[in-house]
Protein backbone atom coordinates (compact mmCIF):
# COMPACT_ATOMS: atom_id res chain seq x y z
CA UNK A 1 0.00 0.00 0.00
CA UNK A 2 1.31 3.44 -0.96
CA UNK A 3 -0.46 6.01 1.18
CA UNK A 4 -0.91 9.51 -0.22
CA UNK A 5 -4.18 10.47 1.47
CA UNK A 6 -2.61 12.60 4.22
CA UNK A 7 0.62 13.85 5.77
CA UNK A 8 0.15 12.22 9.16
CA UNK A 9 -0.07 8.52 8.31
CA UNK A 10 3.22 7.80 10.11
CA UNK A 11 4.23 8.48 13.69
CA UNK A 12 6.87 11.18 13.86
CA UNK A 13 10.45 12.09 12.98
CA UNK A 14 12.59 9.23 14.42
CA UNK A 15 14.75 11.62 16.44
CA UNK A 16 11.68 12.85 18.32
CA UNK A 17 10.71 9.28 19.21
CA UNK A 18 14.27 8.68 20.42
CA UNK A 19 14.09 11.74 22.68
CA UNK A 20 10.74 10.55 24.06
CA UNK A 21 12.36 7.23 24.97
CA UNK A 22 15.52 8.79 26.41
CA UNK A 23 13.60 11.23 28.62
CA UNK A 24 10.73 8.91 29.50
CA UNK A 25 11.65 8.40 33.16
CA UNK A 26 12.48 12.04 33.86
CA UNK A 27 10.21 13.74 36.36
CA UNK A 28 9.12 17.28 35.49
CA UNK A 29 6.33 19.69 36.29
CA UNK A 30 3.12 19.19 34.35
CA UNK A 31 0.83 21.43 32.33
CA UNK A 32 3.64 22.84 30.12
CA UNK A 33 5.56 24.23 33.13
CA UNK A 34 8.57 22.03 32.36
CA UNK A 35 12.06 22.94 31.06
CA UNK A 36 11.34 21.53 27.59
CA UNK A 37 8.32 23.77 27.00
CA UNK A 38 10.30 26.74 28.30
CA UNK A 39 13.23 26.01 25.98
CA UNK A 40 10.93 25.41 23.00
CA UNK A 41 9.07 28.67 23.64
CA UNK A 42 12.34 30.59 23.75
CA UNK A 43 13.59 28.99 20.53
CA UNK A 44 10.33 29.76 18.72
CA UNK A 45 10.47 33.37 19.90
CA UNK A 46 14.04 33.70 18.62
CA UNK A 47 13.13 32.14 15.27
CA UNK A 48 10.29 34.66 14.97
CA UNK A 49 12.51 37.57 15.96
CA UNK A 50 10.17 38.55 18.78
CA UNK A 51 11.37 38.13 22.36
CA UNK A 52 7.95 38.80 23.88
CA UNK A 53 6.12 36.25 21.72
CA UNK A 54 3.59 34.45 23.92
CA UNK A 55 3.69 30.72 23.04
CA UNK A 56 1.11 28.14 24.14
CA UNK A 57 1.26 24.44 23.27
CA UNK A 58 -1.97 22.62 22.37
CA UNK A 59 -2.53 19.09 21.11
CA UNK A 60 -4.29 19.46 17.74
CA UNK A 61 -5.23 21.91 15.02
CA UNK A 62 -9.01 21.93 15.37
CA UNK A 63 -8.59 22.32 19.12
CA UNK A 64 -6.20 25.22 18.59
CA UNK A 65 -8.55 26.93 16.14
CA UNK A 66 -11.74 26.85 18.17
CA UNK A 67 -9.91 27.67 21.41
CA UNK A 68 -8.18 30.72 19.93
CA UNK A 69 -11.34 31.96 18.24
CA UNK A 70 -13.42 31.35 21.36
CA UNK A 71 -10.93 33.46 23.31
CA UNK A 72 -10.90 36.49 20.99
CA UNK A 73 -14.51 36.68 19.78
CA UNK A 74 -17.36 38.29 21.70
CA UNK A 75 -20.69 36.39 21.91
CA UNK A 76 -22.26 38.21 18.94
CA UNK A 77 -19.24 37.85 16.67
CA UNK A 78 -18.10 35.38 14.02
CA UNK A 79 -14.89 34.77 12.12
CA UNK A 80 -14.38 35.62 8.45
CA UNK A 81 -12.86 32.73 6.47
CA UNK A 82 -12.54 31.48 2.91
CA UNK A 83 -15.18 29.09 1.58
CA UNK A 84 -12.70 26.22 1.84
CA UNK A 85 -11.09 27.45 5.05
CA UNK A 86 -10.43 24.61 7.47
CA UNK A 87 -12.66 26.13 10.15
CA UNK A 88 -15.52 26.18 7.65
CA UNK A 89 -15.28 22.74 6.05
CA UNK A 90 -13.18 20.31 8.10
CA UNK A 91 -13.87 20.91 11.78
CA UNK A 92 -17.35 19.43 12.27
CA UNK A 93 -18.73 22.78 13.41
CA UNK A 94 -16.17 23.16 16.22
CA UNK A 95 -16.16 26.96 16.04
CA UNK A 96 -19.96 27.03 15.88
CA UNK A 97 -19.96 24.58 18.79
CA UNK A 98 -18.43 27.22 21.06
CA UNK A 99 -20.96 29.79 19.87
CA UNK A 100 -19.38 31.60 16.92
CA UNK A 101 -20.50 31.56 13.30
CA UNK A 102 -17.99 31.06 10.49
CA UNK A 103 -18.61 33.87 7.98
CA UNK A 104 -17.41 32.23 4.78
CA UNK A 105 -16.82 34.63 1.90
CA UNK A 106 -16.64 33.58 -1.74
CA UNK A 107 -14.24 34.81 -4.37
CA UNK A 108 -17.10 34.64 -6.87
CA UNK A 109 -16.56 34.72 -10.61
CA UNK A 110 -13.70 37.20 -10.43
CA UNK A 111 -11.21 34.92 -8.68
CA UNK A 112 -12.99 31.60 -8.63
CA UNK A 113 -9.81 29.60 -9.27
CA UNK A 114 -9.33 28.90 -5.59
CA UNK A 115 -11.87 29.19 -2.79
CA UNK A 116 -9.30 28.24 -0.13
CA UNK A 117 -7.69 31.68 -0.23
CA UNK A 118 -8.94 35.09 0.84
CA UNK A 119 -7.96 37.86 -1.55
CA UNK A 120 -7.33 41.30 -0.01
CA UNK A 121 -9.66 43.26 -2.30
CA UNK A 122 -12.55 40.85 -1.75
CA UNK A 123 -12.01 40.90 2.02
CA UNK A 124 -11.89 44.69 2.06
CA UNK A 125 -15.08 44.94 0.01
CA UNK A 126 -16.91 42.51 2.31
CA UNK A 127 -15.88 44.23 5.55
CA UNK A 128 -16.41 47.76 4.24
CA UNK A 129 -19.95 46.96 3.09
CA UNK A 130 -20.83 45.14 6.31
CA UNK A 131 -19.72 47.88 8.67
CA UNK A 132 -21.12 50.65 6.45
CA UNK A 133 -24.54 49.01 6.63
CA UNK A 134 -24.34 48.70 10.40
CA UNK A 135 -26.91 45.91 10.60
CA UNK A 136 -26.90 44.83 14.25
CA UNK A 137 -29.30 41.98 13.48
CA UNK A 138 -26.48 40.13 11.73
CA UNK A 139 -23.49 38.24 13.13
CA UNK A 140 -20.66 40.76 13.30
CA UNK A 141 -17.20 39.96 11.91
CA UNK A 142 -14.88 39.78 14.92
CA UNK A 143 -11.74 38.25 13.41
CA UNK A 144 -10.24 37.15 10.11
CA UNK A 145 -8.92 33.60 9.64
CA UNK A 146 -6.46 32.51 6.95
CA UNK A 147 -4.09 29.55 6.62
CA UNK A 148 -0.62 29.30 5.11
CA UNK A 149 -0.56 27.18 3.05
CA UNK A 150 -4.28 27.02 2.34
CA UNK A 151 -6.45 23.89 2.23
CA UNK A 152 -5.47 23.56 -1.43
CA UNK A 153 -1.74 23.99 -0.83
CA UNK A 154 -1.75 27.54 -2.19
CA UNK A 155 0.65 30.11 -0.75
CA UNK A 156 -0.04 33.67 0.27
CA UNK A 157 2.55 36.20 -0.80
CA UNK A 158 4.16 38.56 1.66
CA UNK A 159 2.46 41.43 -0.15
CA UNK A 160 -0.95 39.77 0.29
CA UNK A 161 -0.29 39.10 3.98
CA UNK A 162 0.65 42.74 4.58
CA UNK A 163 -2.43 43.91 2.69
CA UNK A 164 -4.76 41.63 4.68
CA UNK A 165 -3.20 42.78 7.95
CA UNK A 166 -3.69 46.41 6.92
CA UNK A 167 -7.36 45.75 6.13
CA UNK A 168 -7.83 44.05 9.50
CA UNK A 169 -6.26 47.00 11.31
CA UNK A 170 -8.47 49.45 9.44
CA UNK A 171 -11.54 47.54 10.62
CA UNK A 172 -10.11 46.89 14.11
CA UNK A 173 -10.11 43.11 13.67
CA UNK A 174 -7.45 40.58 14.74
CA UNK A 175 -5.81 38.47 12.04
CA UNK A 176 -5.39 34.79 12.94
CA UNK A 177 -3.27 32.49 10.77
CA UNK A 178 -3.60 28.70 10.86
CA UNK A 179 -0.20 27.10 10.31
CA UNK A 180 -1.16 23.42 10.41
CA UNK A 181 1.19 22.80 7.46
CA UNK A 182 3.36 25.86 7.95
CA UNK A 183 6.65 23.97 7.60
CA UNK A 184 5.81 23.01 4.01
CA UNK A 185 5.11 26.63 3.13
CA UNK A 186 8.39 27.73 4.69
CA UNK A 187 10.23 24.95 2.83
CA UNK A 188 8.75 25.89 -0.55
CA UNK A 189 10.96 27.74 -3.02
CA UNK A 190 7.92 29.81 -4.01
CA UNK A 191 7.33 31.11 -0.49
CA UNK A 192 8.38 34.63 0.49
CA UNK A 193 6.80 34.76 3.97
CA UNK A 194 9.08 34.14 6.95
CA UNK A 195 8.39 33.40 10.60
CA UNK A 196 9.46 36.97 11.30
CA UNK A 197 6.76 38.17 8.89
CA UNK A 198 4.13 36.12 10.71
CA UNK A 199 5.19 37.66 14.01
CA UNK A 200 4.93 41.12 12.47
CA UNK A 201 1.83 40.87 10.27
CA UNK A 202 -0.56 38.66 12.28
CA UNK A 203 -2.04 39.01 15.76
CA UNK A 204 -2.09 35.27 16.43
CA UNK A 205 -0.73 32.35 14.46
CA UNK A 206 0.04 28.75 15.18
CA UNK A 207 2.95 26.57 14.17
CA UNK A 208 1.81 23.11 13.18
CA UNK A 209 3.47 20.02 14.57
CA UNK A 210 1.04 17.15 13.94
CA UNK A 211 1.25 17.40 10.15
CA UNK A 212 4.85 18.62 10.12
CA UNK A 213 6.85 15.74 11.56
CA UNK A 214 5.71 15.81 15.16
CA UNK A 215 3.76 13.06 16.89
CA UNK A 216 1.12 15.65 17.79
CA UNK A 217 0.93 19.25 18.91
CA UNK A 218 0.60 22.84 17.75
CA UNK A 219 2.30 25.98 19.06
CA UNK A 220 -0.12 28.92 19.31
CA UNK A 221 1.75 32.23 19.18
CA UNK A 222 0.27 35.55 20.28
CA UNK A 223 2.11 38.48 18.73
CA UNK A 224 -0.34 41.04 20.11
CA UNK A 225 -0.84 41.07 23.89
CA UNK A 226 -4.28 42.61 23.37
CA UNK A 227 -5.64 39.17 22.54
CA UNK A 228 -4.04 36.71 24.98
CA UNK A 229 -5.98 37.66 28.11
CA UNK A 230 -6.65 34.58 30.27
CA UNK A 231 -5.73 32.25 27.41
CA UNK A 232 -4.44 29.58 29.80
CA UNK A 233 -7.80 29.51 31.58
CA UNK A 234 -9.72 29.46 28.31
CA UNK A 235 -7.54 26.61 27.01
CA UNK A 236 -8.22 24.61 30.17
CA UNK A 237 -11.93 25.40 29.91
CA UNK A 238 -11.93 24.01 26.37
CA UNK A 239 -10.06 20.83 27.34
CA UNK A 240 -6.88 21.87 25.59
CA UNK A 241 -4.29 21.62 28.37
CA UNK A 242 -2.20 18.44 28.32
CA UNK A 243 -1.14 17.35 31.82
CA UNK A 244 2.01 15.74 30.42
CA UNK A 245 2.82 18.98 28.64
CA UNK A 246 6.50 18.22 28.31
CA UNK A 247 5.65 15.83 25.47
CA UNK A 248 4.73 18.92 23.47
CA UNK A 249 7.79 20.85 24.57
CA UNK A 250 10.15 18.01 23.65
CA UNK A 251 8.86 17.96 20.09
CA UNK A 252 9.01 21.70 19.45
CA UNK A 253 12.37 21.98 21.19
CA UNK A 254 13.70 19.51 18.62
CA UNK A 255 11.85 21.07 15.67
CA UNK A 256 13.30 24.49 16.47
CA UNK A 257 16.86 23.23 16.89
CA UNK A 258 19.15 23.53 13.84
CA UNK A 259 16.24 24.72 11.65
CA UNK A 260 14.74 21.20 11.75
CA UNK A 261 11.21 22.54 11.36
CA UNK A 262 11.93 23.68 7.83
CA UNK A 263 14.72 21.30 6.81
CA UNK A 264 12.76 18.14 7.69
CA UNK A 265 9.93 19.25 5.39
CA UNK A 266 12.00 19.93 2.29
CA UNK A 267 11.84 16.34 1.01
CA UNK A 268 8.04 16.26 1.18
CA UNK A 269 7.84 19.42 -0.92
CA UNK A 270 10.54 18.20 -3.30
CA UNK A 271 8.81 14.89 -4.04
CA UNK A 272 5.37 16.51 -4.30
CA UNK A 273 6.72 18.81 -7.01
CA UNK A 274 8.26 15.79 -8.78
CA UNK A 275 4.87 14.05 -8.77
CA UNK A 276 3.23 17.22 -10.04
CA UNK A 277 5.69 17.51 -12.93
CA UNK A 278 5.35 13.82 -13.84
CA UNK A 279 1.57 14.14 -14.03
CA UNK A 280 1.75 17.40 -15.98
CA UNK A 281 4.10 15.74 -18.48
CA UNK A 282 1.35 13.19 -19.07
CA UNK A 283 -1.25 15.85 -19.80
CA UNK A 284 -2.97 15.82 -16.43
CA UNK A 285 -4.25 19.18 -15.20
CA UNK A 286 -4.55 20.45 -11.62
CA UNK A 287 -7.34 22.32 -9.92
CA UNK A 288 -4.83 24.78 -8.38
CA UNK A 289 -1.13 25.52 -8.75
CA UNK A 290 0.35 24.23 -5.50
CA UNK A 291 4.03 24.44 -4.58
CA UNK A 292 3.75 22.59 -1.28
CA UNK A 293 3.39 18.96 -0.22
CA UNK A 294 -0.26 18.79 -1.30
CA UNK A 295 -1.15 18.32 -4.97
CA UNK A 296 -4.62 18.31 -6.50
CA UNK A 297 -4.72 16.62 -9.94
CA UNK A 298 -7.93 16.14 -11.90
CA UNK A 299 -8.32 12.46 -12.80
CA UNK A 300 -10.90 10.51 -14.75
CA UNK A 301 -12.64 7.59 -13.10
CA UNK A 302 -10.53 5.27 -15.26
CA UNK A 303 -7.31 6.91 -14.05
CA UNK A 304 -8.46 6.61 -10.44
CA UNK A 305 -9.10 2.90 -11.00
CA UNK A 306 -5.47 2.50 -12.08
CA UNK A 307 -4.34 4.05 -8.79
CA UNK A 308 -6.72 1.80 -6.87
CA UNK A 309 -5.45 -1.34 -8.60
CA UNK A 310 -1.88 -0.36 -7.71
CA UNK A 311 -2.75 0.14 -4.03
CA UNK A 312 -2.16 3.89 -4.14
CA UNK A 313 -4.39 5.71 -1.67
CA UNK A 314 -5.62 9.30 -2.03
CA UNK A 315 -8.43 11.59 -0.96
CA UNK A 316 -11.23 12.58 -3.31
CA UNK A 317 -11.33 16.35 -2.90
CA UNK A 318 -14.28 17.26 -5.12
CA UNK A 319 -16.26 16.22 -8.15
CA UNK A 320 -15.28 18.22 -11.23
CA UNK A 321 -17.80 16.87 -13.74
CA UNK A 322 -19.55 13.62 -14.66
CA UNK A 323 -16.27 12.02 -15.73
CA UNK A 324 -13.62 13.54 -13.46
CA UNK A 325 -12.73 14.08 -9.82
CA UNK A 326 -10.15 16.27 -8.17
CA UNK A 327 -8.06 14.14 -5.82
CA UNK A 328 -5.50 15.11 -3.19
CA UNK A 329 -2.05 13.55 -3.09
CA UNK A 330 -0.26 14.41 0.11
Name every feature range the model reports, one short phrase each.
Residues 2-288, 292-310, 319-330:
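Conserved PLP-enzyme active-site core in the AAT-like
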Residues 315-316:
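Nucleotide-binding motor/catalytic cores of P-loop/tubulin-like NTPases across gene-expression machines
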Amino acid sequence: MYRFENDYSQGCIPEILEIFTRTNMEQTSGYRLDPYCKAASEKIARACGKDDLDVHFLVGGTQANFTVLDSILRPHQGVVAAQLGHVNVHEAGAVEGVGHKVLAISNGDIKKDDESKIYPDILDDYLTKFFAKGDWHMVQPGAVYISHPTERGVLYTREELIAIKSICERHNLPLYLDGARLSYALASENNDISLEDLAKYTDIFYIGGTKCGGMFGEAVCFTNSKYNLDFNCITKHNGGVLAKGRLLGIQFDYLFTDNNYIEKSRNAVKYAIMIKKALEDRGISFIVDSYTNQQFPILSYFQKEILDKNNITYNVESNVDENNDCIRLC
